[in-house]
Amino acid sequence: MAKKVVAIIKLALPAGKANPAPPVGPALGQHGVNIMAFCKDYNAKTADQAGMIIPVEISVFEDRSFTFVLKTPPASVLIRKAAGVERGSNEPNKKFVATITRDQLREIAQTKMPDLNANDIEAAMNIVAGTARNMGVKISD
């Protein structure tokens, strides 16, 4: 019989830099999970994506064991990286901070595709374009 899940914890952590300090320690500690084991596993799996924020979904079972699933980086992080800006506009649609091409948009959409609720790449591109627009990033043809 399958183990019973007692909690699902969602965190967004820097790749390869998880440590027992907050937010990881308190989130996992209250469920009795071995924090160091999670940190070592997470850091090993994300070592090749240094500098990115990687969301993780941790399933905690009643025997205090756990499994985790890595998600794709947030669209905003990928857009900022492609545009080469530190942060989005504080007045989106009035002040534009950068421009990205349709090719860059397609690349970001392909990266995000497993986590998006979209059936094809065009729908995924529209979702990512909306995020870019809300950040004050223009899309050029």
Swiss-Prot record:
GO CC annotations, alphabetized: cytosolic large ribosomal subunit
Gene3D superfamilies attached to this UniProt entry: Ribosomal protein L11, C-terminal domain, Ribosomal protein L11/L12, N-terminal domain
SMART domains: RL11
GO biological process: translation
Key words of the record: Methylation, Ribonucleoprotein, Ribosomal protein, RNA-binding, rRNA-binding
Organism domain of life: Bacteria
InterPro entries from the UniProt entry: Ribosomal_uL11, Ribosomal_uL11_bac-typ, Ribosomal_uL11_C, Ribosomal_uL11_C_sf, Ribosomal_uL11_CS, Ribosomal_uL11_N, Ribosomal_uL11_N_sf
MF terms (GO), sorted A to Z: large ribosomal subunit rRNA binding; structural constituent of ribosome
Subunit structure: Part of the ribosomal stalk of the 50S ribosomal subunit. Interacts with L10 and the large rRNA to form the base of the stalk. L10 forms an elongated spine to which L12 dimers bind in a sequential fashion forming a multimeric L10(L12)X complex.
Name the record gives this protein: Large ribosomal subunit protein uL11
